[in-house]
Amino acid sequence: MTASSRPAEYRDVRTANLNTITFDNLFDKDEAELKRLIESCEKDGFFYLDLKSAASQKFWNDLYTIDSTTKDWFKQPIEKKLQTPTVSLAHGFKAVGNQSGSIESKKDGFEALKIGKSELDGRWALPDVVSDNLPLFDQFASSCHFISKLLLDCLSDGLNLKGDARFETHHRDDCRSKSTLYFLHYPPGAQDPNKVGQNMHTDIGTLTILYAPQWGLQVFSPADGAWEYVEPRPNQIIVNVGDTLRFLSGKRFKSALHRVLPLGGIQIEDRYSISYFLRASDSTEFKDSDEDESNAKQWYTKKYAMYEMPHVIQKQQTTLSGGMAQELQATF
């Protein structure tokens, strides 16, 4: 997308210079593409994944259909959405304003529908929108999981990991995890300017698959401490490294520090995005950002609680950013 083709208000904003990885080149482990993948995880923890080949068309068709379906779901009255079966932090509904927002002292400006992969596979406590469209949600979750696992396999190969040291051993499909489909809606916020965006953070898990066709996502630049917008691109999704992969890689990979902040600090239109969070098996052990012994489930619970803490407490601890804010000297 050229600057002239951007929305007028974003025409002159600074954008992140992220690598693009071609997914088809990873199937046969193209050496040059593996090298670029490793470099992307080491340097930025964020990259574009090109999915424009004919083989990816089913993925895009499903994504556009599920995007339309969940947009309709978000149009329901809040009273109806609050009745969504919520059985864990990874499965259910999150209302606007439950967490700290992207501007200090303000709350977040998004609501979310969370569909845990374990719950989806087990047909457990599924909201009607999922039950009524089960083949669609099944197929889309499977596609996202496949993409994530192939990337993980390539990262293990790129680091020449063997046996139990390979990242896939911590992501077995027969073990429970907090892997989740995540549908986000940022409603127009002019009526409540105290609820804005999504706070600076790193993701909890291993890899995030993100479809964000509208502007608003920012990443932190370690080069000069500036926040840069991530440009939406056609036929490409965004992938970012989460805390667990950073810890499992001995902090060789960076978990990307990011946030969602509309220009001017007010969301002027409905904004939607779709994520799939690949997370390690609950029992996966590692040393966290404070070098304390932890596991994937404990880190998930600890970090999710931190999302809801006031900014003043978040600043005092490493949990919100997995230690990246302290390492990069990032501020709200």
Curated annotation (Swiss-Prot):
Gene3D superfamilies: B-lactam Antibiotic, Isopenicillin N Synthase, Chain (2.60.120.330). Its cofactor is Fe(2+). 2-oxoglutarate binds at residue 271. Pathway: Mycotoxin biosynthesis. It holds the Pfam family 2OG-FeII_Oxy. Keywords: Dioxygenase, Iron, Metal-binding, Oxidoreductase. Its EC number is 1.14.-.-. Fe cation binds at residues 201, 203, 258. Disulfide bonds: none annotated. 2-oxoglutarate-dependent dioxygenase; part of the gene cluster that mediates the biosynthesis of butenolide, a mycotoxin that shows antibiotic activity but does not seem to play a major role in the spread of head blight in wheat. Butenolide is derived from glutamic acid via a 4-acetamido-2-butenoic acid intermediate. GO terms for molecular function: dioxygenase activity; metal ion binding. Induction: Highly expressed under trichothecene-producing conditions. InterPro entries: IPNS-like_FE2OG_OXY, IPNS-like_sf, Iron_ascorbate_oxido_reductase, Oxoglu/Fe-dep_dioxygenase_dom. The lineage of its organism: Eukaryota, Fungi, Dikarya, Ascomycota, Pezizomycotina. Residues 176-280 form the Fe2OG dioxygenase domain. This is 2-oxoglutarate-dependent dioxygenase FG08081. Belongs to the iron/ascorbate-dependent oxidoreductase family. Binds 1 Fe(2+) ion per subunit.
